[in-house]
A protein has these predicted regions:
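Conformational coupling and interaction surfaces
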Residues: 2, 18-22, 29-30, 167, ...
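Metal-dependent C-N hydrolase catalytic cores
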Residues: 2, 46-115, 119, 284-293, ...
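Active-site histidine-anchored catalytic micro-motif
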Residues: 2-51, 92-193, 198
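Short, charge-rich amphipathic segments
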Residues: 37-45, 66-67, 100-113, 224-246
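A residue-level signal for conserved active-site and pocket-lining positions in enzyme catalytic cores
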Residues: 63, 176, 244
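Short, surface-exposed amphipathic charged segments that create phosphate/polyanion-binding patches used
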Residues: 76-83, 160-163, 201
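Short clusters of hydrophobic/aromatic residues that line enzyme substrate/ligand-binding pockets
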Residues: 87, 164, 262
Length: 311
């Protein structure tokens, strides 16, 4: 049995690596890749998503371009994209699949409505999914689960309070968390438990072929962006690829129920995910939250998924 998923993302090198994992994993059936504005403008994320899908060899997977910006707030500019290889800077030398004519939110809604209940894996802002739910409220009952990389129970990674993916569109995140859909949240604090190690990069390189070389290039480029923080991990977290891996196998993570709400009004805390593990609010839990990862198993699962794409 494979789990049907839609991968909504903002590629980005980390998202591109997650696309490779989602396409190659034996337990996943990747039905669509949808992109939108996030770390890069919407046209660049769509192009990068199309490149990543072409590299997998799975040209049957539709790739759509979506949200040009957030639902309400002005679009943020990441300001941290100092990658020196892979998809940043722009790579016109790499093959790309043709983009689907539909908007990402339309493609999400149509794929969900047409088939068995799908899991939505998100590794970027939640704008496309929120728009799909606004377009077609009926699809909420047909989404099996949302597995999303975003938020934090501690410090933010963009402001003192907020993590990037949620801060890019807090109103969209609030719509998703309030839609009554089962959610697995992978906060950056929890995702930090699986890092990009020299052995992981070597393992990708050892796979060989264009896919293995591309995966290794993506991993190396991500390491160049790492800036150690006072309380953060001592290595670059793997981040986005963890989302499809946990969707396929939740036993890779330690997961606990919690109440998750998104701050929409605070002067200093706008975009913060308020994760109530102890039930202090009196509100029912609305998410399963990843608080730890088995790094060795995550690494093996990632390499196994990419190995299935190597010709």
């Amino acid at each position: 049995m494979t789990l049907p998923i839609i991968h909504d993302c903002d590629p980005g090198n980390d998202d591109a690596l997650a696309i490779l994992v989602a396409a190659g994993h034996a337990g996943l059936d990747l039905r669509a890749v949808t992109t939108g504005a996030g770390h890069l403008a919407f046209d660049r994320t769509a192009r990068n998503g199309a490149i990543a899908v072409a590299r997998t060899g799975r040209r049957d997977i539709p790739v759509a371009s979506g949200a040009e910006g957030p639902l309400v707030r002005e679009r943020l500019v990441a300001g941290v994209l100092d990658f020196d290889s892979a998809l940043d800077p722009e790579r016109p030398d790499l093959d790309a699949v043709s983009l689907d004519a539909r908007h990402s939110s339309e493609l999400i809604a149509e794929v969900v409505a047409a088939g068995e209940a799908a899991t939505i894996v998100t590794t970027g802002p939640l704008t496309n999914l929120a728009m799909a739910l606004q377009r077609r409220p009926d699809i909420a009952g047909r989404i099996a689960r949302v597995v999303t990389l975003g938020g934090a129970w501690g410090l933010g990674n963009k402001t003192a309070a907020a993590e990037w993916n949620i801060l890019c569109d807090p109103e969209a995140a609030a719509i998703v968390f309030g839609a009554g859909i089962p959610v697995t949240l992978i906060p950056v604090d929890g995702a930090a438990g699986a890092g990009i190690t020299p052995s992981l990069i070597a393992g990708a390189e050892a796979l060989g072929g264009p896919v293995g070389a591309f995966a290794a290039e993506l991993l190396r480029s991500l390491v160049t962006t790492f800036r150690p923080g006072l309380f953060g991990p001592s290595h670059m977290p793997l981040n986005d690829p963890v989302a499809p891996l946990v969707a396929a196998d939740p036993t890779l993570a330690r997961i606990v129920p919690a109440r998750v709400d998104v701050e929409l009004a605070g002067r200093f805390t706008y975009g913060r995910t308020v994760i109530d593990f102890a039930g202090k609010s009196g509100l029912p839990a609305n998410a399963e939250v990843v608080i730890g990862l088995d790094e060795a198993r995550v690494h093996r699962a990632l390499l196994d998924a990419i190995a299935r794409l190597v010709k």
